[in-house]
Amino acid sequence: MDLFDKCHNYTEAKEAIAHGIYPFFIPLTDNEGTEVVFKGHRLIMCGSNNYLGLTTHPKVREAAIEAIKKYGTSCTGSRFLNGTLELHERLESELAEWVGKEAALVFSTGMQTNLGTVSALIGRDDRVILDKDDHASIVDGARLGYGRIERYNHNDIDHLERVLVSIPETAGKLIIVDGLFSMEGDLADLPRIVPMAKRFGARVMVDDAHGMGVTGQGHGTAAQFGLTKDVDLIMSTFSKSFASLGGFIAGDEPVIHYIKHHGRALIFSASAPPANIAAALAALEVMRSEPELIQRVNDNAEKMRKGFQELGFDTGASQTPVVPIIIGDNDKTFLAWKMLFDAGVFVNPVISPAVQPGRQLLRTSYMATHTDDQLERVLEIFSRVGRKIGLIP
């Protein structure tokens, strides 16, 4: 058998392209934040993670431009060698303070943050315990480690307890959860997870890629529950509320120091470019100086949740700016996506394995910079499309 046979036999995506219902890798010709353009077709963007709308904020843009002028376009090296600027260390210091931890470590992407952190910490005699809805980067980081992976049903703390009971007391244990689950917009049940972890001698890591800047007055999901000091590690990315690219892990200084010297995804990757680091720093400053943006994005999300529910859509357990429209069928999910796209609304169709079978959905997400007129227009188009294909009465 030829290794490439599977490549030549893979036809699903090409069939979707031929039928005009391929929803991925859409090349936008303009991106103004809340609105985008594809081949001259203007759409309201309800599929972005730009929660605070900071990609177009003047202070963030200017910081990136000035960093390029001062440092150039790239560090052309690993953080471990020549790729660390004072900007990186300044950002690490400010992030640690923002999330209430002793130290932080900046990686080049969020994916690399999880790959480097989890694989560095999990050894042969250790167990990593994952929520079944955890992000793929957490799963891949766990696979790169030499320990054993255990999984429990989504936010099912009774199942988590059974898993912990089954693990030998001698094993090191790390529970990893998304703070804000990225597909359905619900929050990890940290008020129950944290005391259970303490009971079994397990450490807790929260991947707050989607929660940072949104929950806990911007400080994240652990802060929202008053558990910042009780959570051992807090991870986030810069590609959402921070309007940039990169990621970080924060925790006690000895732990961060260890990851710094054992995280292969950090050591063997080029460092995040100056513009990205400067943009993230500026975004953090905007979060401090303009907290009304954090309130605004949550107000917009509540408006849309209520609007969708009044129309008859199922928004699941969403509590955040990620608001799913649960459809439960592949064909209807793609059909709804196509009709919404043609009508001027950009959303993301999500099917298995990204969600469990029967939970296929349209992932919508909202920004602080969406206007009331834009949001009303989105509800109007959803109402029309939903009725046309039988999603709502």
Map each language-model feature to its residues.
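PLP-dependent enzyme catalytic core of the Aspartate aminotransferase-like
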Residues: 3, 58, 62-66, 70, ...
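N-terminal "arm"/small-domain region of PLP-dependent enzymes with the aminotransferase-like
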Residues: 5-73, 202
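Conserved N-terminal alpha-helix of the aminotransferase class I/II PLP-enzyme fold
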Residues: 62, 66-110
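Active-site phosphate-binding strand-loop segment of PLP-dependent enzymes
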Residues: 150, 154-206
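Active-site PLP attachment segment
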Residues: 223-258
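Conserved PLP-binding catalytic core of the aspartate aminotransferase-like
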Residues: 295-302, 309-344, 354, 358-359, ...
